[in-house]
């Protein structure tokens, strides 16, 4: 075979969507630009698929079809400005079940007391420590936020203890968080209206946190129980797993939207295992699969476990959720009439 024949090998005809981006002279809005994402390629195509999947779920729900939407996210999502987007989704009842980590609970409460401050990645962390300033990436959290948080949490623990004594049983973590929402409603001002916990309480949307003690809430519980050695305050994790699994089992269809990895991701897809897998899945992650971690496991790996149905509609978008999620939510919830560019 000649070199030319090798290099210019004849190809078979293939059918498919033409790779094409927006011509900016013609685009009239950001929505029009994003409508091309599906055709751009690479992760833009995956984001386009995520928009398509969530729109399908939302349109079914609007027609009255039962699809229970599970939303999972790690604490850094609430550390960032995505907190307000998630709070809006909860306020508008666009999700039905939430799973997060301890930071995803406590930082939401803290932000209703005092804001986090935009900082920088390249700083002297030893100097920050001297100043009592904690760093989450390029977000600064002065320690006075946690001091203020303690002022609210210690009386809240006393309140929970009275509730548990009245019920003659411990509260589950989801009940504990529900009571936090009630407490916010009673004690805090207007800023609570940007809170996930507050709107979850108002709309009776459960927030599950299997690792509720793995953060500042755990620190406060330590201080509380050390100072009150006879305290019977307990948070029940066991009954929450029953409640979470049953929310999956009893759903006609489920959709799982997961930002990041870790515990929230597995808690949601494992609950869906009990019903034969979730029907729709959107992962947004920067984790890689080659280390075998759950955080990096792609949706198709979940299929092998029965946690995602073999015929499910799913996609993983690799990238920073702070870039991706605002576009995704806007295109699904606010720009519904903007379809794919032809």
Swiss-Prot record:
Belongs to the deoxyhypusine synthase family. One of its GO terms (cellular component) is cytoplasm. It is an enzyme of class 2 (transferase). Its EC number is 2.5.1.46. InterPro entries: Deoxyhypus_synthase_arc, Deoxyhypusine_synthase, Deoxyhypusine_synthase_sf, DHS-like_NAD/FAD-binding_dom. Its cofactor is NAD(+). One of its GO terms (molecular function) is deoxyhypusine synthase activity. The keyword Transmembrane helix does not apply. It comes from Pyrococcus horikoshii (strain ATCC 700860 / DSM 12428 / JCM 9974 / NBRC 100139 / OT-3). HAMAP family: DHS (MF_00153). This is Probable deoxyhypusine synthase. Pathway: Protein modification; eIF5A hypusination.
């Amino acid at each position: 075979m000649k070199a030319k024949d090798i290099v210019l090998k004849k190809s078979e005809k293939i059918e498919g969507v033409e790779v094409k981006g927006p011509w900016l002279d013609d685009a009239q809005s950001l929505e029009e630009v994003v409508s091309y994402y599906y055709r751009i390629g690479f992760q833009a195509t995956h984001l386009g698929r995520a928009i398509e999947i969530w729109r399908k779920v939302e349109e079914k729900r609007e027609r009255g079809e039962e699809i229970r939407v599970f939303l999972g996210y790690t604490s850094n999502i609430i550390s960032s400005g995505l907190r307000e987007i998630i709070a809006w989704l909860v306020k508008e009842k666009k999700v039905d079940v939430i799973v997060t980590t301890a930071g995803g609970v406590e930082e939401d409460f803290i932000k209703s007391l005092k804001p986090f401050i935009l900082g920088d990645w390249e700083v002297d962390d030893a100097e920050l420590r001297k100043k009592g300033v904690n760093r989450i990436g390029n977000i600064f959290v002065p320690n006075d936020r946690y001091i203020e948080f303690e002022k609210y949490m210690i009386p809240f623990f006393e309140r929970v203890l009275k509730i548990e004594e009245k019920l003659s049983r411990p509260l589950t973590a989801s009940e504990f968080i529900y009571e936090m929402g009630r407490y916010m409603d009673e004690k805090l001002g207007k800023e609570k209206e940007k809170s996930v916990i507050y709107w979850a309480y108002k709309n009776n949307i459960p927030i599950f946190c299997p690792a509720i003690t793995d953060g500042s809430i755990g620190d406060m519980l330590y201080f509380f129980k050390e100072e009150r050695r006879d305290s019977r305050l307990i948070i029940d994790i066991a009954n929450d797993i029953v409640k979470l699994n049953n929310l999956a089992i009893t759903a006609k269809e489920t959709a799982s939207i997961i930002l990041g990895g870790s515990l929230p991701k597995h808690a949601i897809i494992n609950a869906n295992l009990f019903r034969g897998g979730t029907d729709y899945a959107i992962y947004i992650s920067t984790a890689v699969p080659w280390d075998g971690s759950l955080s990096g496991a792609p949706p198709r790996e979940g299929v092998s476990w029965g946690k995602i149905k073999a015929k499910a509609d799913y996609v993983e978008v690799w990238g920073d959720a702070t870039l991706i999620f605002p576009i995704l939510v806007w295109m699904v919830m606010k720009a519904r009439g903007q379809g794919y560019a032809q």
